[in-house]
Each structure stands twice: as C-alpha cells, then as structure tokens.
Amino acid sequence: MKSFLLLLITCLFSRSAWTQSDVQKRYQTQLILADNGSTVNLDQGTFTFTGSLSLEDKKHIVIRGKGIDKTVLSFKGQTDGAEGLRVSNAEDIIIENLTIQDTKGDGIKTMNVKGITFRNVKVEWTGPPKADNGGYGLYPVQCDNVMIDGCTAIGASDAGIYVGQSRGIVVKNSQAYHNVAGIEIENSRNADVFNNEAYENTGGILVFDLPDLVQKQGGNVRVYNNYVHDNNLPNFAPEGNIVAGVSDGTGLLILAANRVEVFGNRFIRNQSVGTGIISYLITERPITDKGYYPFSSSISIHDNVYERDPGPPTSRGRFGKLFHSVLKFNQDIPHILYDGIADPSTLDKEGNPLPDRRICIRNNKNQSVANLDAGRGFQHVSRDAAPFNCQLDPLKITVGNDR
C-alpha cells in the first residue's frame, strides 16, 4: 500500500511539472491555430512562462481566462521576448478575465488592431516600483476602436494604462496605482476616459502629444467622472523617458494637447499639481519634427473638485524645482497651473487667444489658477482667474461605449 501511494504521489508531481513546463507551448499553439471567430480558453491557475505569447493576423478572437487572479500568467523568469502577450495586425480581438505578471517589458501590447477590448484584465509587477519594471501595462498602439473596461495596472515604469496613436478609445471602470503614470492618452483621437480611479502614482492621468511619432496630433479627449487622488509616488521612470520629467504630486497633466475637456472629476491630495496645462516647449527638449505642434489649446476644465492637504509641494521633478527656486508658492500652491506659452498664430491683435483656442477654467470647487508666464521667464506670474472665465462648446465624441 505504501509503495502504491509513493508511486501515485510521484506520478502526480511529475504530471504537475510536465503541465507547468508544457503550458506555454500549448497556449502558443492554440493562438497560432485558432480559427477566426474562435475562443482560446485559458485554465485556472498560476503558470510560469519564459517567452512571450503572440497572436497575429487573426479576426474575431477571444482570449479568455477564468478571472482576474484566477488565471495568472507569470513572466518572472522571462528570457525570450519582452511582452507577456503581443497581438498584431488583427481585427476584433477580446482579451478578458486574466492576470499578467512581471513581464520583462510591456504586459500586453496590441499593435495595428482594428477593434481591441481589454475586459477584467490585470497587469502587475509584483515587487516594489523600480526603473527596470516593464514600461507599459496595457499598451494598445496604432489601434482603432479601443475598449479598456474593468482593468487594473500596477507598477509600470512608464504608464500603467497607455493608449498611443490610436482612434476611438474608451478607458472606463479601471484602476491604476503604483505606476509612474496611471493612465496616459498619447497622440490619440476621440477618447473618453471616465469612471476610473488613479491613485498612488507619480502622475494620475496624462494627456500628451509628442513629436517624432507616426500619428502627429491627437485631440478630442474627454476626461470625466474619475477619482484621481494621492498621486505622490516618487518618479521611478528610467532616465531620459518623457515621463521621467513628471513631478510626483501630479493629478492630471495636459502636454501639447488640443481639444481636451475635463469635468466631473475629483482631484484629491495630489500635493504638487492638481491639473497642469503646458507646452512641450517648457521641457526644453529640441524639436526636429517639422509636423509637430507643441502648444496646448482649446482646453476646458470645469465642474471638478480640488482638494489638497496643507503643506509644501515636493521638490522633485521640474514643477517641484520651479516651485522652490522660481515661483516660491510655498504652501499656497494653485490647484490649476498653466505655463502661459501660447501659439502666436492663435492670438488676436491684443494678444488674447482666439475664441475657439482658449484655455477655459470655470465652476470648479476650490478653484485656484496661476498663469506661470513661462515663455517670458516667469516674469509676470498671475493668479488672476478672470482671463480663464470662458466656455467652450462641449466636445462630442462618438466611440463604442456599449461594447
């Protein structure tokens, strides 16, 4: 009887080891052989991978686990590839109900996909925040019709939830924490970001337009009904990354973006900048892209709530250094900061912005504003909110919110 039990236990352990080592090959084979319109079901359990999984040139595929923290794909010992899962040149793909952990690079990257949905997906780096964590958690780039719903991103050294150079975007009902940037919309058009919680990041939400990218200018971005709080994590991005310049204590940062509407949000205990509106010129990085537009314009910030604990801002990051050495706001930091750098071609003869290119800030609880006059060396910093007391037409964005 004892010999039989020992044999049984040995067989069970051997089977377990075989399954764990074989599962990567099995899942990759399923992805390669999947017929258009099929579902790839992933088992419950924690599985360790040494290389990336990939799906290419497929249509109408569902990749489905058993649930967040029930199907866990761990890449902690990854030696081959960078992403955990990569999807490219595809159409109508759904990824749902799974967790990706500790990838060498990005968690899930989708590129050139028409119709991509992330639903109930978590991507995380399980150790402390550090520069050699992967850059992006969820990373759709150059995609159309992007839906991110009920997802979680933790520990990315760039952005937890990032949508770049894409069109027709919804990011909703999601959480991002312990990242450099919680949620980032970059060089993307027609985006709705709502009902999310971004907290304990360096910066909660970023809306950026950057040079030297295929899609030159984003716009039509709405950020609304989000809870953006306690984003005071020291910046741990690798040196040289654009987000390495984001000051800890940043709630929302709008950089060189146009046609952005921000409303119904709660910006709470972000100790440096509740909302910042800046030009790329303030970064002092060279611009060689002749098609790049480095100014922010047509920005509407209204009906938000701002709160901050008493105390000085951080001294880290570009804004932190400005606060301490140039602006000297001490503990009385305005919640909303505008660098004051405008495109001269958008100003009338009196130097005022044309009606459709204004920065409008109104009806915010605890509202306080400063124009930093950065273009003239911060000579005439103004805390007068009157020039921003205007109203732009609400943005109208048609994206697939019901997917």
Language model features with spans:
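Parallel beta-helix/beta-solenoid
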Residues: 35, 57-59, 68, 85, ...
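Acidic, glycine- and Ser/Thr-rich low-complexity intrinsically disordered tracts
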Residues: 283, 289-297, 302-403
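Right-handed parallel beta-helix/beta-spiral solenoid domain characteristic of secreted/periplasmic
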Residues: 20-25, 41, 57-104, 127
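N-terminal signal peptide c-region/cleavage motif recognized by signal peptidases
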Residues: 14-16
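Sec-dependent N-terminal signal peptides
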Residues: 4-12
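Extracellular beta-strand/beta-solenoid scaffold signature
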Residues: 27-28, 50, 76-86, 102-109, ...
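Short, T/G/N/S-enriched strand-turn elements that build extracellular solenoid repeat scaffolds
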Residues: 27-34, 48-57, 63, 74, ...
